[in-house]
Structures are given as structure tokens and as C-alpha cells.
């Protein structure tokens, strides 16, 4: 009796900063195909069956949370061709800028992920020239600089 073919797809997990090396080692040891973009290494793309992806996160092999497709309210599945193109782009062009599709709007708490202010946390304010990062000492003083969206990530991610 023939068995149904397994549906393998790309699933996306958001992890904490600095976890990518451990996750890469675990997934390699388990023989699971995956991709972690170097310039946005809180995203882990898993190429596996949905049930196995769920088990990896539930068992703590990959610590994080899945990205959900808000239209279908199911785990986001990245189409094969789209993932191949993305991997090719960021592999062949290491300076390609990976930017979050999460809107960074006035009031968003962010962390600087590259450049001389890497590691600094602050709040985004809008200005005519783009966005500014503000670091405040409440009720006393605040300092701000113009910064590019690609240099910051929302803190909740």
C-alpha cells in the first residue's frame, strides 16, 4: 500500500540574539536542512515536515517561536523558489541588507544591530530626514542620532 508523500516546506522560527551558533550545531547534528542569514541571524529557516518543525521547537532543540501567516493563522511556509532566491541573494552578495518587514514607527523600542552604536537600545522618532534613535534618561535628558532602518531591529523580535 503506497504511503502519502511527506510535505516538506520551509518554516521560520524567530530566536533570541546570539543563539544561532548553538542552533546551527544542533540542526546539523540532527541532519536537518536549515538556513540562518548571517546579517539577520535571529531568523532560522527550517526545511522539514510541519510536525517535525513543531517537535523541534516544542522539545527545545530550537528555542524560539514560529512566524505565523496572519492571513491563514497557520505557520508561515516559504515557497521553495522564494527561499532559493533569498538564500542565493544573501549568499552571493554578503553585503545584501536584510531588513525586517516589521514596521519601525514612531515610539518603537529598538536595538542597534550594526555600526558604531551596535548594542544600544532606544526609541525611534520620526524626522524629515528619516528616523532618529533616541536614548533617554527619564525626566532629565535624551540624545538622538539619525539612523537607517537596516541598522535597527525591534526589541520584541
Place the predicted regions along the sequence by residue.
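Short loop/turn segments at connectors of secondary-structure elements within structured domains
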Residues: 118, 129-131
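Acidic-enriched and Gly/Ser
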Residues: 1-109, 124-127, 134-157
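Short coil-to-beta-strand transition motifs
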Residues: 104, 113-120
Amino acid at each position: 500500500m503506497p504511503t502519502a508523500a511527506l510535505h516538506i516546506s520551509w518554516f521560520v522560527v524567530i530566536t533570541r540574539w546570539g543563539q544561532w551558533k548553538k542552533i546551527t550545531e544542533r540542526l546539523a547534528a540532527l541532519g536537518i536542512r536549515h538556513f540562518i542569514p548571517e546579517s539577520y541571524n535571529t531568523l532560522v529557516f527550517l526545511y522539514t515536515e510541519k510536525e517535525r518543525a513543531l517537535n523541534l521547537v516544542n522539545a527545545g532543540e530550537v528555542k524560539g517561536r514560529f512566524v505565523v501567516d496572519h492571513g491563514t493563522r497557520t505557520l508561515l511556509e516559504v515557497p521553495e523558489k522564494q527561499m532559493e532566491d533569498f538564500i542565493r541573494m544573501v549568499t552571493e552578495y554578503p553585503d545584501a541588507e536584510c531588513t525586517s518587514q516589521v514596521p519601525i514607527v514612531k515610539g518603537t523600542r529598538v536595538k542597534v544591530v550594526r555600526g558604531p552604536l551596535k548594542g544600544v537600545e532606544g526609541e525611534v522618532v520620526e524626522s524629515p530626514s528619516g528616523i532618529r534613535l533616541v536614548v533617554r534618561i527619564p525626566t532629565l535628558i535624551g540624545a538622538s542620532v539619525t539612523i537607517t532602518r537596516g541598522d535597527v531591529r525591534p526589541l520584541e523580535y
